[in-house]
Amino acid sequence: MSSPGPSQPPAEDPPWPARLLRAPLGLLRLDPSGGALLLCGLVALLGWSWLRRRRARGIPPGPTPWPLVGNFGHVLLPPFLRRRSWLSSRTRAAGIDPSVIGPQVLLAHLARVYGSIFSFFIGHYLVVVLSDFHSVREALVQQAEVFSDRPRVPLISIVTKEKGVVFAHYGPVWRQQRKFSHSTLRHFGLGKLSLEPKIIEEFKYVKAEMQKHGEDPFCPFSIISNAVSNIICSLCFGQRFDYTNSEFKKMLGFMSRGLEICLNSQVLLVNICPWLYYLPFGPFKELRQIEKDITSFLKKIIKDHQESLDRENPQDFIDMYLLHMEEERKNNSNSSFDEEYLFYIIGDLFIAGTDTTTNSLLWCLLYMSLNPDVQEKVHEEIERVIGANRAPSLTDKAQMPYTEATIMEVQRLTVVVPLAIPHMTSENTVLQGYTIPKGTLILPNLWSVHRDPAIWEKPEDFYPNRFLDDQGQLIKKETFIPFGIGKRVCMGEQLAKMELFLMFVSLMQSFAFALPEDSKKPLLTGRFGLTLAPHPFNITISRR
């Protein structure tokens, strides 16, 4: 357990992650006439920095920032910049390939240097990283009212208008919208057996698509993504889309491409200079066009629902929202329930609900392909409890501890949202003896939490039995938090758990999965983005 209070950093030369953040930016060659001016400027800036750090005394330890640029956020650089920076040569010199290292890994290494709670600066913004379960729980649960806000990130603010349920600021409007959204999703089956038939029905299409490949290798990404998206569509839109539907395929492509641009392109510079968003070329122009296309698609669906709304028999989330919106307008002229907010909530549900569960299932397929002994035990348990002919049910969960433990172990190792969604403090506070000022950006490193050797024995090993007791029964560990904890916990957690169990068991019941012969072992580092996605891989299937 983490001990409270500031800890002294080691006296010896720190390891490579700390050196990366403390290294000088390089020597400037100047003509003599500019030297004096530069020197005066540097003295002023260093004085400003020193005074600022004096004011911030008591914050968690961390690498010394440079004036203006702070630590320059090297640990958060996307691959397109990381490959072009001095970070690349220094990490390679340390024997690490920067192209496959995500920020969650670099931050975990820094925690070994500075402690489980440490800080760094991006420009003048203070960032505090929480690296173990106890600090995450104290912040997000015990001080939830202080740590539940979202930071004001220019790119996110422009794209989302700070609406929806994922990126909206913490307050009365967010609470109202989240409460309604969660209760409405539960009404349509979230976490209930009534949603089972839709998931099982969708698996039939997955099975048919996979069987088309016969014994040939194929990439399962689009098949899984289509299926997961359709389950969200059935809840939100009241319909599913055929996998060959051109509009549906285009929308999934737009959303995937939009996320890629936002997280791994020059568009990230919008967070420094917001006006860059409106540049008429390159990824800036492409992102704006994608926004227009997604907006057109979702607003057409909302309009269709308005025209066909049956007030006595609402069919889906949009119908329920429209009815609630009408009721609110009668009683509250300042209500936050309007078409624009509905649009952003639908976008949140569609994008976040698709990306997280899709990648969790893909990781499961990859780990089964890499661990045939574990896959065989899962097959045996499915055969014993369900057999070959009956579809799985959530009621089977209690009798399938090894299968459940296998899913949990995949989630532990791959934590699909490794740094959660960043939080922000809404007032000054103290966390384990450290001063955390108002407006501090908080990064809960869930990846680090799930690889903490103080909690998990041999944390790098894939070992489902760690979730089983001596009698082979499932152990519920409070330190297992792949969906986060606190007031901002993933709203779709129950849906994701249902989809993961029913889809995974259905896949294992129907097929055995393997990597193609003579193929290279896929990297297990993952691709950092909104979620931690596996690198592209192919698999082969054999009927069971």
Curated annotation (Swiss-Prot):
> Which pathway does it take part in?
Lipid metabolism; arachidonate metabolism
- What's its EC? 1.14.14.80
Q: InterPro entries annotated for this entry?
A: Cyt_P450 (IPR001128), Cyt_P450_CS (IPR017972), Cyt_P450_E_grp-I (IPR002401), Cyt_P450_E_grp-I_CYP2D-like (IPR008069), Cyt_P450_sf (IPR036396), Cytochrome_P450_fam2 (IPR050182)
Q: What class of enzyme is it?
A: oxidoreductase
Q: For this UniProt record, give its keywords in alphabetical order, as a comma-separated list.
A: Disease variant, Endoplasmic reticulum, Heme, Hereditary spastic paraplegia, Iron, Lipid metabolism, Membrane, Metal-binding, Microsome, Mitochondrion, Mitochondrion inner membrane, Monooxygenase, Neurodegeneration, Oxidoreductase, Transmembrane, Transmembrane helix
Membrane topology summary:
Multi-pass membrane protein
| Subcellular compartments | Endoplasmic reticulum membrane; Microsome membrane; Mitochondrion inner membrane
According to its UniProt record, in which tissues is this protein expressed?
Widely expressed with stronger expression in thymus, heart and cerebellum.
Q: Which GO terms describe its biological process?
A: cytochrome metabolic process; omega-hydroxylase P450 pathway; organic acid metabolic process; xenobiotic metabolic process
Protein's recorded name: Cytochrome P450 2U1
